[in-house]
Design a protein with these regions (language model features):
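Soluble catalytic regions of membrane-associated enzymes that act on cell-envelope
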Residues: 1-87, 120-122, 139
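Active-site catalytic loop in hydrolytic enzyme cores
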Residues: 65-136
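CN hydrolase (nitrilase-like) catalytic-core segments centered on the catalytic cysteine
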Residues: 17, 23-25, 32-56, 123-216
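A short catalytic or substrate-binding loop motif that flags glycine-/basic-rich loops and adjacent residues
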Residues: 62-65, 109-110, 206-210
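A short acidic, often aromatic-flanked loop/helix-cap motif at beta-alpha or helix-coil junctions
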Residues: 63-64, 86-89, 190-191, 210
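Short, surface-exposed linear segments at secondary-structure transitions and domain or protein termini
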Residues: 87-95, 209-218
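Short linear motifs in intrinsically disordered
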Residues: 61-62, 104-110, 172, 180-184
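A structural signal for well-ordered alpha-helical scaffolds and beta->alpha junctions
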Residues: 3, 41, 95, 111, ...
Length: 218
């Protein structure tokens, strides 16, 4: 299973945080993935994985919330953040309709997230979900690192897809903080890392195209 593979990977690699991309594999949108998600959470709790490695998970629907939800889970905190920027017709309705959890549409959050940041090893981390990163934060305290959980796969137009991911990552860095590193984690490979001095880590990008787990050094 993915969890067992992840445990094996973590036993061989020293990491500070485990981050999942935005995905539809885990969540509560239907009974099948809900059961898979419950099993994942149960195993994490049994192994107390969150005490060894803080986790930034992503769920397609979370418990009663009909939206994409990022969950930061550490020994000290469990912080939820909903996806704020939903695309009309594709992810949400046009007129603010409310949909049930099992719908193929999501619900627009009624208010902005209170928690967009968390601190790990004295580093203030800005966690964003996909297109949320394209819109500037009103916070006056800049993050030391931005992590974006993304799934651009529906924009995959063949040979130009690489540029789509790259341009989205660059625009996000302009938006969130031009002076700190940014990691844009893609669900089907193509993870982009941009350093504080704007260098692209193409080694990480290439590895992410075929490796299920990768270590990113900042």
């Amino acid at each position: 299973t993915l969890y067992n593979d992840l445990k094996l990977f973590l036993s061989k690699n020293n990491v500070d945080i485990v981050v999942f991309s935005e995905n539809v594999y885990y969540g509560y949108k239907n009974h099948y993935i809900a059961e898979r998600t419950r099993q994942l959470i149960k195993k994490i709790e049994q192994d107390k994985l969150f005490t060894k490695h803080p986790l930034l998970l992503s769920f397609y629907g979370y418990e009663y919330i009909n939206n994409v939800v990022a969950v930061y889970w550490s020994q000290q905190d469990m912080i939820l953040r909903q996806k704020e920027i939903l695309i009309p017709f594709f992810e949400k309705g046009v007129f603010g309709e409310e949909y049930s959890l099992i719908s193929d549409r999501l619900n627009q959050p009624k208010s902005k997230n209170k928690h967009g940041y968390f601190t790990m090893n004295n580093i203030r981390i800005n966690a964003r979900i996909c297109y949320d990163a394209l819109f500037p934060s009103i916070s006056k305290t800049y993050p030391g690192l931005t992590i974006i959980q993304s799934d651009y796969s529906w924009l995959n137009n063949g040979s130009a897809y690489k540029n789509t991911i790259l341009n989205g990552s660059i625009l996000s860095k302009f938006s969130v903080n031009i002076h700190s590193p940014l990691i844009n984690i893609q669900n089907y490979g193509g993870t982009i890392v941009i350093s504080d001095d704007w260098k692209i880590n193409w080694d990480v990008y290439n590895k992410s195209l075929y490796m299920p787990f990768i270590v990113i050094e900042i």
